[in-house]
Each structure stands twice: as C-alpha cells, then as structure tokens.
Amino acid sequence: MASNATHAFARTDRTALGLWWWTTDRWLLGATALLVTLGMLLSFASSPAAAQRIGIDDQFHFALRMCFFATASSVLMLITSMLSPRDIRRAAFFIYLGAIAVMIALPFIGHNAKGATRWLQFAGFTLQPSEFMKPALIVLVSWMFAEGQKGEGVPGVSIAFLLYFIAVALLLIQPDVGQTVLITIAFGAAFWMAGVPISWIMGLGGVALAGLGSTYFLFDHVHARVQKFLSPDQADTHQITRAAEAIRAGGLFGRGPGEGVMKRHVPDLHTDFIYSVAAEEYGLIFSWSLIGLFAFVVVRGLYKAMKLNDPFEQVAAAGLFVLVGQQALINIAVNLNMIPTKGMTLPFISYGGSSMLAMGLTLGMALALLRKRPGAYGASGEFGFGRADA
C-alpha cells in the first residue's frame, strides 16, 4: 500500500493524478490548504458564541457545518484544478448562465434577509448564486478580451461589457453594492491586463466612481453605513466598535483559544467579523500572519499568471487572484474600521456555504490555468517543459 501511494506521486507516474500533482503549483495549493485549515480552526472559536446568540443548543453547530463546507470546497477545488483551460471556459459559461438565471428569479422566489434578496433557500441550506457568478464572469470576460485581440471579427470587448453589465444590474436589484464593487474592480483589472488603452480604463474608472457615489443616494442601507463610518458619534456603531475592541484586547499573542470575551458581543462574529475573533484569541502576530498568507497567495498567483504565454490564461488567472485578494482586503479593512461596513466574507475563513464553495471553485480555476503545460510558460523552460514548438 505504501509503495503504491509513493508511486502515485513519483515523477514517473503518468496517471491523471500523478500528472496533476507534478504540474500544479504546490506552494499555492499548500497555502490554500492552510487557509482552509485555519478557517475550520477559527470556526470552533466563533461557533459557541454565535450559536448561543441565536438560540441554537449545539454550540458547535456552525463549526461542524463549516467543516463540511470546507471539505466540499476542497474537493471542488481539486477537481476543478484538474481541468484544461478549454474545460474551464466551458464550465464558466454554464456556471454564469445558471447563476444569472437564478439571480433573475430571486426577486420572485428568493429568501429576504436584512433587507436584501440574495439567497435561494432549500432543504435547510441557502445558496447565494452571485458568489458563483463572480469567478465565472472573470473567466468569460478574459476569454472575450483574448478573442477580441485576435482580430478575427469577434466583438470581444463589447461582449465582455455586456456580460459585466448584466451581472451588475442583477446585483443592484438585490441590492448588493459590495459584490458590485468587487466584480467591478476585478473586471477593471482584467480590462487593464488585456492591454486595453488607458483612456478606456480611465473612462471605466470614472463611470465606476460615479456609480459608487450614486449608491449613497439610491440605497438607504448604503447611506446609513457611510454615515455611521463618517459620524460614528452620531450613529449606532455597536458591531464595529466591539470588533475593534476585540482586536485591541488580543494584544500581540491573544487571550488564548476559546478565551475571547468581546466576540460574544459581535453579532456577525462567525462571518463578517471572524478576523476580529482571530485577533482577540490568537493576537496581532497571528492576524498579521493571516494577512501575509493571503498576500502570498495573491502575489504568487499574479506573478505566475504574468509568465503565462496565452492571453486568455494570463488575464483570467490574474483576474481570479485579484478577486480573492480584493475580497480579503475589503473584509479585513471593515474589521479594522478603515471603510464602511459591508457584509462580505473573508475567503476560506468566514462561515458560509456559498462563499466556501465559490472560493474553492475560484482557486480551482486559477490553479488549473497556472498548471505546467507544454508551451504554457516562456521559452526559458522554467518549469521543465519549454515551448512546444522549440
């Protein structure tokens, strides 16, 4: 048994699993596995207080569900990372269509929570289709940008903008301004990396800023959150105040596992404010290391993406890592009271089935695009292949 297991990961193994293992970026794979593990660890720290707050008898209710979602997310990531770039495009096409179809139906059959209709509820679970739409959108617009560059009459840029505006319109109907901002940033990054003229990018940025400003006047919850951020003395800032106190209370080394006190007063401690739980129980050194781990994943992912030869693979992989990094940045910035509050999860760390599965899909797609293939990277042969036509 041991010899068979060893052979499965030997360089001479030509099975699908063996080829996957030796062509996948194992540094990124390991860093992602560490994030998933930390997410499960922190769920056991936050679950008792979260369960008690909403009257659930099983104090590890959220932790056990988190472990289930983390396992499912890991399996999804591994399966997706084995796909070819062509299969990634196909999967993104069908995922985007499915997610958009459900988002269109949400106003009629969706579950409303906190004034927004973003979820489909069934069999005790809730599904947020916009989470799956995000990586699919980035892959599709990257594909369209690449097709447009070929000069074969495909209106790639126009199709990419159409896909983007459809997604934005449906997000604003829910409403979900945070996800709109997130996909706009990732779309803009893909737009820039595709080599679009800077004047177009500046125009897109201007429109995006104008649109973001208009949400302050169009949506009451956005107006309220911005006002709380700008005038904390004149508004109820209980949650963000308690989160900040939790971070300060942890000091450098934290109170210790399970010893957090301030987390009991943070309503969304297991989701949006899990970072403050990490800081209180494990300290600033741990929470800074968590930021460093996210930075490693994003920076290494972007570095590898920039070395790819194929325009689609390069832009799509980079866009997916921007998506992950920006979401982590927004969540942590909210916890540190640097920006107005926004219900956005910390990738792989916060509790949430849709978020966990979608992040597994996102990183799986990115890992698949970064895999070592003949001709995928430069002629230097950095990854042992060299160009196919060399």
Curated annotation (Swiss-Prot):
Alphabetized GO MF terms: lipid-linked peptidoglycan transporter activity; peptidoglycan glycosyltransferase activity
Pathway entry: Cell wall biogenesis; peptidoglycan biosynthesis
Transmembrane segments: 27-47, 60-80, 91-111, 125-145, 153-173, 181-201, 279-299, 315-335, 348-368
Residues in coiled coil: none
Entry keywords, A to Z: Cell cycle, Cell division, Cell inner membrane, Cell membrane, Cell shape, Cell wall biogenesis/degradation, Glycosyltransferase, Membrane, Peptidoglycan synthesis, Transferase, Transmembrane, Transmembrane helix
Subcellular location(s) per record: Cell inner membrane
EC number: 2.4.99.28
Organism superkingdom: Bacteria
GO-annotated biological processes: cell division; cell wall organization; peptidoglycan biosynthetic process; regulation of cell shape
Membrane topology, from the record: Multi-pass membrane protein
Resulting phenotype, T180A: Decreases interaction with SidA
InterPro entries associated with the record: FtsW, FtsW/RodA
GO cellular component term of the entry, any: plasma membrane
Swiss-Prot/TrEMBL catalytic activity: [GlcNAc-(1->4)-Mur2Ac(oyl-L-Ala-gamma-D-Glu-L-Lys-D-Ala-D-Ala)](n)-di-trans,octa-cis-undecaprenyl diphosphate + beta-D-GlcNAc-(1->4)-Mur2Ac(oyl-L-Ala-gamma-D-Glu-L-Lys-D-Ala-D-Ala)-di-trans,octa-cis-undecaprenyl diphosphate = [GlcNAc-(1->4)-Mur2Ac(oyl-L-Ala-gamma-D-Glu-L-Lys-D-Ala-D-Ala)](n+1)-di-trans,octa-cis-undecaprenyl diphosphate + di-trans,octa-cis-undecaprenyl diphosphate + H(+)
Top enzyme category: transferase
Pfam families: FTSW_RODA_SPOVE
Transferase keyword on record: yes
NCBIfam families: ftsW
Main function: Peptidoglycan polymerase that is essential for cell division.
Family of this protein: Belongs to the SEDS family. FtsW subfamily.
Subunit description: Interacts with FtsI, FtsN and the cell division inhibitor SidA.
Protein name: Probable peptidoglycan glycosyltransferase FtsW
